[in-house]
Design a protein with these regions (language model features):
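Proteins enriched for Cys/Gly/acidic motifs involved in redox and nucleic-acid/cofactor modification
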Residues: 31, 53-64, 88-96, 105-113, ...
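Conserved, mostly hydrophobic/aromatic
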Residues: 5, 33, 74, 94, ...
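Conserved SAM/AdoMet-binding glycine-rich loop
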Residues: 1-84
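Flexible glycine/acidic-rich beta-alpha junction loops that bind and position SAM and/or redox cofactors
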Residues: 12-16, 35-46, 77-84, 100-125, ...
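Terminal RNA-binding accessory module
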Residues: 117-209
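Short, electropositive alpha-helical surface patch
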Residues: 15-29, 82-99, 124-129, 158
Length: 209
């Protein structure tokens, strides 16, 4: 009943794709666009062919084309040569973005890659500290994104029930919980009422079965 797109590059974001997401309710209003780093210097070191300004314009375009869209991303922390100032620049940039979810990874050496051979590897304790700081920001950004939808009624596809609480996903990939009687695998109109765990708690308004 739901189709979710995987990780995409900017060149894949065509007007036709936006129209498809808007017009076909099977498609989730969710896009995963990997940023990788929020510092232009680190992006250049990673040999990425974009900078933060270009990425910000891309996000602005996506949000204007698909209202309510959720944009998730990947962030790599501790890339060789990353300074504290560059890491802080990354935090500052991410803080300005409206990400629904951030997957934060520490840089891991891959044998045979130029980065693995560099002598300016970030020490593991420093890398670990930066991961924790970026994850804390990620949690804050997720909560900030969820707050935008409290009070709205959205379609939720419920999936699993545990101890009387059923959870599922909106079409823009927000985890929703309810203690109402619902059937797994069915879509319901749910009023989103308050932050709860990693998502929002709500109550069923209409069943779309």
């Amino acid at each position: 009943k739901r189709l979710r797109l995987g990780s995409l590059e900017s060149i894949e974001l065509s007007p036709d794709l936006f129209e498809l997401i808007r017009s076909d309710e099977r498609f989730c209003a969710h896009l995963h666009l990997p940023l990788q780093a929020g510092s232009d210097a680190v992006l250049k070191d990673m040999n990425r062919h974009y900078d933060t300004a270009e990425f910000a314009r891309l996000i602005e375009r996506v949000e204007s084309e698909v209202p309510g869209v959720a944009v998730s991303t990947d962030i790599i922390v501790g890339f060789p040569g990353e300074t504290e100032d560059e890491f802080q620049s990354g935090l500052d940039f991410v803080a300005k973005m409206n990400f629904s979810r951030m997957h934060v990874f520490p840089y891991s050496r891959r044998s045979g890659t130029p980065a693995a051979e560099r002598q300016d590897q970030v020490p593991e304790p420093v890398k670990k500290d930066r991961v924790h700081r970026m994850q804390a920001l990620a949690a804050y950004k997720a909560e900030e994104f969820h707050r935008q939808f409290i009070g709205q009624t959205m379609r939720v596809l419920f999936e699993t029930t545990t101890d009387g609480i059923t959870d599922g996903l909106t079409d823009n990939y927000i985890r929703v919980y309810t203690d109402d009687s619902v059937e797994d695998g069915e879509i319901y109109e749910v009023r989103l009422e308050q932050l709860y765990q990693d998502g929002i708690f709500g109550h069923v308004v209409v069943s779309n079965k």
